[in-house]
């Protein structure tokens, strides 16, 4: 007996086999069904006062918007938007920085740049609702090798001053 299977049919059968092996899907908590929004560094202060004080006192990124303002006259609108990606909190993402007037609490690179949107964590205080232990890879979104060379700085995992 000869069987003829199209590649699509084989792929579909493989996918169904994998899904069957995984079993029924678990219910997703309501919180997991929506995207967390940015709440700003000041929302971290009530529970993380020591880290907040250290960050706002010593971390250069806590006042990173000043760098944009210093260079603003020399930059195009598109270049400024590119700066927003690393020098503000959550630019281009739900609840992230829009502009200095509408979202002043997000105008610098705050806690959530590294730790992710804090909406759920601020409500629950559950450590699973925020990125806690950071790695150097977490820094590489902004601290690329090109920027390290251009600005002569390197990512420091504890460079957030906490």
What do these predicted regions represent?
Residues 2, 22-25:
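Classical N-terminal targeting signals for secretion and organelle import
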Residues 27-135, 151-162:
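Sequence context of c-type cytochrome heme-c attachment sites
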